[in-house]
Amino acid sequence: MSSTENPDSVAAARELEALRAEASALRRQLAESPEQLREMESRVDSLSIRNTKLMDTLKEARQQLIALREEVDRLGQPPSGYGVLLGVHDDQTVDVFTSGRKMRLTCSPNVDAETLKLGQTVRLNEALTIVEAGNFERVGEISTLREVLDDGQRALVVGHADEERIVWLAEPLATVFEESERESVAYDAESPTRKLRPGDSLLVDTKAGYAFERIPKAEVEDLVLEEVPDVHYDDIGGLGRQIEQIRDAVELPFLHKDLFHEYELRPPKGVLLYGPPGCGKTLIAKAVANSLAKKIAEARGQDSKEAKSYFLNIKGPELLNKFVGETERHIRLIFQRAREKASEGTPVIVFFDEMDSIFRTRGSGVSSDVETTVVPQLLSEIDGVEGLENVIVIGASNREDMIDPAILRPGRLDVKIKIERPDAESAQDIFSKYLVETLPVHSDDLAEFGGDRTACIRVMIERVVDRMYAESEENRFLEVTYANGDKEVLYFKDFNSGAMIQNIVDRAKKYAIKSVLDTGAPGLRVQHLFDSIVDEFSENEDLPNTTNPDDWARISGKKGERIVYIRTLVTGKNASASRAIDTESNTGQYL
């Protein structure tokens, strides 16, 4: 430093330099402060997010602790008991059957004793207080109702081994329609709320002594078909006379009761339809039920679409049961069902198909004598103490000679109608039900009649019937030898039936479909029907019974002199040579 410099100026220069450095530092700090601020703000945001997550975690943990505490409390609760409500008292106490004991208990404040119903299931806590009302019991033993006692709250039922007991009726059973109410509502005999009748199956808790529910009889449901059949008289061909007979026997008494009463004429109790298989016996019975329902609906001023009648179609062979008395019990249940339906004023037809399988002549059984008790059961139902108002029995059989004579006498099955095999005129009528104008007809056949479809179908039917009923060599079926030595040639027309005619038409339709697939030419032809006739005849070659030709002939509708020998005479497409059928001395069972 120069000697001439002033010390004060030097100090001032240093101070100035220090101030400049401090100012520069302040400028740097001022420049860096926004970045620090942003960093601090970022840290604050991060801490806030962590704080929120920690709060959510704590809240979730608190909820889990509460749920676990509730689960621990629930698992630590003593078990609840159940009982059946027997009675409610004015002091809000109730009688309950629980654990094999009858106890008087109190209700929780959450349960209103006035809303409890007799027979209802209730839940009890550890202090034997009712804390909840449940439903009625759904499982138990099945017992048969013998009668409802005079108080209307109890019933006499029969359980296993004919053990009788008195039970209370739970509220669903105790609440029944009165006679006046049944007239004002649409009363259904199968409704769960209908009046109980002897023979009903009830769900019973024998320990609590309560009956809870009426159970439908499954065994009877399997044996009967309740419906208005969708079959009309117009659907049946070739049986005009027989249809008129059965209409006179069944419809007139229902539709004109006043005239029958005026002339003191008792309506028939039953009708027997007999004849060869496949000739329309079941169809007629169904058509009667349909027609009767519509006629009664019209007489009452109701819409025919609302027509109501009942057709109980009994599956005959299924009635037979290996256990003694079961068949008779089913017959009783069936007629009980018929009386229930008829009590509504609705006609009921009880139709026994294959009647000879159930009610054959007593003493004729080869390996069993079940008919000795089944036949009297039917007789007692038809003309027993309880009348069959609005109920008519229709039986069908192709072996009427095997039905017990007591069933066929007047006063039981009064009217007997034979369903004959169709003759040529009847066959044309039957063909017209299946060969209708809506079917496709081959153009060549239509061209023969100038495109007149009606004339073409009519002539087609005439040609087919002429082919079927011609006594020609190709139509010969059997040569039978009678016991007196006489011989007779039987033709296929002697064994024709409505079912066979339907089968022939179905075969022809199949031929027409195959023709379309092969040639592309659509339509039914007369030749298709001719081929179907040959096929049908050929398939029947082996049908004559080889064991007892006389029984087979009876079923087929050929009665008279006893047949001892049969020889087939089938010729034509795919037919085998004529052959003899040996008969055995020990005839055994037919078919």
From Swiss-Prot:
Pathway: Protein degradation; proteasomal Pup-dependent pathway
GO cellular component: proteasome complex
Key word DNA repair present: no
Domain of life the protein comes from: Bacteria
Coiled coil: 8-77
Entry annotated with the keyword Chaperone: yes
Sorted UniProt keywords: ATP-binding, Chaperone, Coiled coil, Nucleotide-binding, Proteasome
Annotated binding of ATP, by residue: G278, C279, G280, K281, T282, L283
InterPro entries given in the database record: AAA+_ATPase (IPR003593), AAA_ATPase_domain (IPR050168), ATPase_AAA_core (IPR003959), ATPase_AAA_CS (IPR003960), NA-bd_OB-fold (IPR012340), P-loop_NTPase (IPR027417), Prot_ATP_ID_OB_2nd (IPR032501), Prot_ATP_ID_OB_N (IPR041626)
Recorded family membership: Belongs to the AAA ATPase family.
Protein known as: Proteasome-associated ATPase
Naturally occurring in which organism (per UniProt): Rhodococcus opacus (strain B4)
Lineage, uppermost ranks: Bacteria, Bacillati, Actinomycetota, Actinomycetes, Mycobacteriales
